[in-house]
């Protein structure tokens, strides 16, 4: 990471997010308190991701606008975080373990208050379960996953880039696939 600025505040930063987007989230969240317009130039091929979209969505919900032009993120000065009450979404990462159990056993699982409009990237794990033959429904109570009756699954290839936290959950299902499950970008 390289940060440049004039005396009195930072104005821009350059950042490679190919290995982790956590530094970008941190810079985005601190930008409104700098007192200057702030631009973050992304130097890597990867420019965005599910966790960055979560960060930007939360900033927006707290009254801070962050613009993304495809290469750089721009935060205008003069913005302040404003919110007195905020309802935190259920943890989709943890919910995926229960969804995987339904897939593995051929049973049914509903995790209350988890819905498809969640901003969390791990929700993409449900797309994997659908490819494996599970039935996924967003009910009033929460997302319901029903596994296949026989507990057998086809082999598939999955790009885990936007939900890499679920790599181990998928690995737990892998021994029960009829052929190989391949993952990529799981780091």
Feature locations, PLM:
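Short, structured segments at the rim of ligand-binding sites
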Residues: 1-184
């Amino acid at each position: 990471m390289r940060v440049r600025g004039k005396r009195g505040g930072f104005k821009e930063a350059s950042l490679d997010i190919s290995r982790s987007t956590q530094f970008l989230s941190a810079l985005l969240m601190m930008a409104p308190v700098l007192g200057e317009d702030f631009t973050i130039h992304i130097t890597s091929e990867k420019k965005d991701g599910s966790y960055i979209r979560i960060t930007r969505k939360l900033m927006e919900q707290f009254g801070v606008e962050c613009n993304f032009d495809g290469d750089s993120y721009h935060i205008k000065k003069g913005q302040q975080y404003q919110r007195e009450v905020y309802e935190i979404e259920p943890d989709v990462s943890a919910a995926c373990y229960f969804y995987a159990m339904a897939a593995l056993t051929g049973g049914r699982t509903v995790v209350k208050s988890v819905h498809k409009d969640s901003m969390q990237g791990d929700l993409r794990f449900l797309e994997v379960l659908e490819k494996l033959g599970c039935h996924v429904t967003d009910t009033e109570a929460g997302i319901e996953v029903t596994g296949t009756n026989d507990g057998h699954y086809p082999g598939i290839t999955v790009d885990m880039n936007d939900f890499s936290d679920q790599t181990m959950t998928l690995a737990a299902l892998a021994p029960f696939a009829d052929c190989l499950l391949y993952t990529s970008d799981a780091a």
